[in-house]
């Protein structure tokens, strides 16, 4: 069971982070990053690190909530969630941009944020497992892809040039911006709170240990590559001819829906058709044939009756009546 959890979690973390890089809908891009983080959680449980899984679950909600709140203000103000229709909002919506960066830093393995400590514990757990040569690169690669996905979303919304959808984008009401900025402050203070509560160790930064440098390097690689690709003229915002098939495959969730329809749905549909055919041909056919045979037998019986039995019964009845009447009259 633990091996299955590790396999499912590792595959989910890696595949979901890859799919997120090909999404143009901001909500889908973030939802796959959520799936990737929960893949880390499954890996921690499968490796026997329940405390590590608890730390991953503890440091995740606030940064992700901050990211979603910042993106929500953008979607309300621009009436679009298509990343290709946004851009150039840093000069118009800097507060929400800072809030998004704060939430993204809280999820990345970037010291001194809480996500760095939790992912460092997971990497240490992978190094102590029975297959460190496989699990350690998987964690580092998934972290790189998550960082690249977050920077990609930021670059396509706040970087680049303005579009017709983002040309007139003003800051939202304080009823939305104030809670977002307060949550940003809470995310910044989250590692301090966890150190104060004894959840994380201060050595000298929260979560700093033997696996700190490889984890930090994977984060910087993801940030640097994604910023170089998307903060410029955004060449990857549209499919590249040489990578069009790969991008389309990832954008359609690796054709998971088509595979599901061709396997599970096809089997269920075949079984339902077989059940309908058997009910129509076997059950309804048997009952219909039995009823038809009974009606045909009754019809043939009515045609073969000659009328003699009816006359015999009438004669017998009349005889009984006459006998009864004679007995009544003959009685003194």
Feature annotation, model-predicted:
Residues 140, 145-146, 209-232:
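Alpha-helical membrane-embedded segments
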Residues 1-172, 186-187, 192:
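Hydrophobic transmembrane alpha-helices and their helix-loop junctions in integral membrane proteins
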Residues 100-101, 181-191, 316-326:
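Hydrophobic alpha-helical transmembrane segments of multi-pass integral membrane proteins
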Residues 110, 188-193, 228-230, 323-331:
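Alpha-helical transmembrane segments of multi-pass membrane proteins
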Residues 169-223:
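Hard-cation-handling environments
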Residues 77-88, 149-153, 156-171, 202-204, 222-250, 323-328, ...:
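Alpha-helical transmembrane segments
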Residues 203-207, 236-332:
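Aromatic-capped, Gly/Pro-kinked transmembrane alpha-helices
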């Amino acid at each position: 069971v633990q091996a299955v959890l590790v396999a499912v979690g590792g595959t989910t973390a890696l595949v979901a982070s890859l799919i997120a890089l090909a999404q143009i809908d901001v909500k889908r891009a973030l939802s796959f990053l959520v799936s990737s983080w929960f893949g880390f959680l499954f890996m921690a449980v499968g490796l026997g690190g329940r405390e590590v899984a608890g730390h991953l679950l503890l440091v995740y909600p606030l940064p992700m909530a901050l990211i979603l709140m910042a993106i929500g203000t953008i979607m309300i103000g621009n009436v679009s969630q298509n990343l290709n229709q946004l851009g150039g909002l840093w000069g118009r919506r800097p507060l929400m941009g800072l809030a998004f960066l704060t939430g993204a830093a809280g999820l990345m393995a970037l010291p001194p944020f809480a996500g760095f400590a939790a992912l460092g514990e997971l990497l240490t757990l992978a190094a102590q497992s029975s297959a460190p040569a496989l699990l350690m690169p998987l964690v580092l690669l998934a972290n790189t892809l998550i960082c690249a996905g977050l920077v990609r979303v930021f670059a396509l919304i706040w970087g680049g040039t303005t579009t017709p959808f983002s040309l007139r984008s003003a800051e939202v009401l304080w009823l939305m911006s104030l809670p977002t900025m307060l949550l940003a402050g809470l995310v910044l203070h989250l590692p301090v709170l966890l150190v104060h509560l004894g959840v994380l160790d201060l050595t000298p930064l929260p979560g700093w240990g033997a696996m700190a440098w490889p984890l930090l390097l994977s984060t910087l690689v993801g940030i640097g590559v994604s910023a170089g690709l998307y903060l410029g003229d955004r060449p990857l915002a549209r499919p590249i001819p040489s990578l069009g098939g790969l991008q389309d495959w990832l954008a359609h969730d690796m054709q998971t829906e088509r595979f599901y329809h061709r396997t599970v749905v096809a089997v269920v549909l075949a079984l339902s058709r077989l059940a309908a055919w058997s009910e129509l041909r076997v059950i309804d056919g048997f009952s219909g044939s039995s009823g038809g045979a009974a009606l045909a037998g009754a019809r043939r019986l009515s045609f073969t009756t000659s009328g003699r039995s009816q006359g015999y019964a009438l004669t017998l009845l009349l005889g009984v009546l006459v006998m009864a009447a004679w007995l009544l009259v003959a009685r003194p």
